[in-house]
């Protein structure tokens, strides 16, 4: 966790923020008080010892027998604290002890479960967020907090993502009841009824099948909305998710608040509005993908594995509020949802960001607009979303219920995001490769999800002119006939 004035707790990381001048404020600050949740990541530990090893991306720590981590945590008042552990456990027999001074909490870890098919040496592991039995006592001031892992002398590790420390009196306010959480979520019935939809990473990196790539704004002007929408209808997709930005902050619409943050990156043509209208005429819903770090100019990964910051926490929230409010008011019910990327990184960089305020901004113009924040394989650390982002890429285990029972997305509407590409963007010149899975396997997966009221989104490689490769089209036609019966 980063040290900051808005934090009730701080963990000593030695990592400083870089701030630019504030963005214009249209209303009262979104970060107005102290939050009482602190998260300790392996990348910000002051010590990593024994057999513990920070992974190459600095986003989790592999712990086998005799592994340890340590942080220095500052708290304003002495008290008792609840503990939540986000980890993946591959084999039984691991034990964990969290200690500060004479206070300690011990736990025997069970094997974690979820929908990911775990692969040796791969990234797909079933992380869960576990509430630990017992309280940790911390005194006012600086407290050394250590995590010690012991386990069987065999193959297998505990993958540590983070430890959350919450004051007991504040836990009820920070962790709403299941009833109150569900009460503020949008209805996902239409999403479930759709069964499956498609996503396109159509960006300034997207290549044509042949010839020279056009500048992004020229590609926007040349985009054939009717041909694209007819293609989606032929695929049988119930909705489309389109990248508004990705690696670069382009925006295919004249959004003034976006232009204020990223001058020159918006377009005169309102391609988003035209697509929303053309798809709606075919009873197909329209959603937007937004990469939050790109929107808010998060810089390179720093020495702690966290983004180097351009804006303050308050500015990060205000940028989202301003942009989402304008987009929401402009498109109203024509915009059915959002899929926000890179939020496990965003929340690590901005630990006190008021996600509830960002979530509320998502509803401007359409209270039933569905929203998710992508935490990838890691547990979702906010109740303020309507469905699980479900970034899978390849085929994994299908869901067994509408609301996820175990794993990273526990409690949320079940949703899987696949990709016909091994990556997400067709960024190399030439033909798009054939899908990485067969039509038969995709049909079986989508059908199994539909039977349990889970939703599947298929990211399809797309050319700059808005067309797809014939092999992808053939696969989607087969899926349509199998699922839609026509």
Residue ranges and their predicted role:
Residues 15-77, 81-486:
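Mature catalytic domains of secreted/periplasmic carbohydrate-active enzymes
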Residues 1-11:
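N-terminal export signals
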């Amino acid at each position: 966790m980063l040290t900051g004035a808005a934090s009730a707790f701080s963990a000593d990381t030695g990592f400083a923020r870089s701030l630019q001048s504030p963005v214009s404020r249209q209303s009262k600050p979104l970060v107005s008080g102290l939050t009482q949740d602190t998260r300790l990541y392996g990348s910000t530990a002051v010590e990593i010892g024994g057999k513990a090893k920070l992974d190459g991306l600095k986003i989790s720590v592999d712990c086998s027998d005799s592994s340890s981590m340590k942080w220095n945590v500052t708290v304003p008042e002495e008290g008792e604290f609840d503990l939540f552990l986000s980890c993946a456990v591959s084999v039984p027999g691991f034990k964990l002890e969290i200690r500060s001074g004479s206070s300690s909490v011990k736990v025997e870890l069970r094997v974690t479960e979820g929908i990911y098919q775990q692969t040796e040496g791969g990234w797909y592991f079933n992380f869960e967020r576990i509430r630990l039995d017992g309280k940790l006592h911390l005194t006012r001031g600086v407290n050394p907090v250590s995590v010690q892992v012991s386990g069987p002398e065999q193959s297998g590790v505990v993958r540590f993502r983070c430890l959350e420390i919450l004051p007991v009196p504040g836990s009820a306010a920070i962790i709403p009841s299941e009833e109150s959480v569900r009460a503020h979520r949008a209805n996902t019935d239409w999403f479930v009824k759709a069964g499956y939809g498609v996503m396109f990473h159509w960006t300034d990196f997207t290549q044509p099948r042949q010839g020279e790539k056009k500048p992004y704004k020229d590609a926007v002007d040349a985009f054939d909305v009717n041909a694209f929408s007819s293609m989606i209808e032929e695929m049988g997709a119930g909705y489309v998710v389109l990248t508004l930005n990705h690696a670069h902050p382009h925006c295919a619409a004249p959004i003034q608040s976006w232009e204020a943050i990223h001058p020159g990156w918006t377009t005169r043509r309102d391609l988003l509005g035209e697509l929303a209208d053309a798809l709606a005429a075919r009873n197909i819903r329209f959603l937007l993908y937004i990469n939050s770090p790109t929107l808010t100019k998060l810089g390179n990964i720093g020495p702690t594995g966290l983004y180097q910051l351009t804006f303050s926490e308050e500015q990060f929230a205000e940028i989202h509020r301003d942009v989402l409010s304008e987009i929401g008011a402009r498109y109203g019910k024509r915009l059915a949802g959002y899929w926000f990327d890179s939020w496990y990184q965003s929340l690590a960089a901005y630990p006190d960001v008021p996600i509830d305020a960002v979530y509320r901004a998502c509803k401007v113009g359409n209270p039933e607009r569905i929203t998710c924040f992508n935490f990838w394989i890691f547990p979702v650390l906010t109740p303020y979303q309507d469905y699980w982002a479900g970034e899978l890429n390849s085929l994994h285990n299908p869901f067994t219920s509408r609301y996820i029972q175990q794993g990273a997305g526990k409690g949320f509407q079940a949703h899987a995001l696949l990709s016909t590409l091994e990556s997400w963007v067709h960024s190399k010149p030439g033909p798009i490769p054939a899908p990485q899975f067969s039509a038969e396997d995709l049909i079986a997966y989508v059908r199994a999800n539909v039977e349990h009221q889970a939703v599947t989104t298929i990211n399809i490689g797309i050319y700059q002119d808005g067309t797809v490769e014939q092999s992808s089209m053939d696969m989607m036609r087969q899926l349509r006939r199998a699922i839609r019966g026509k």
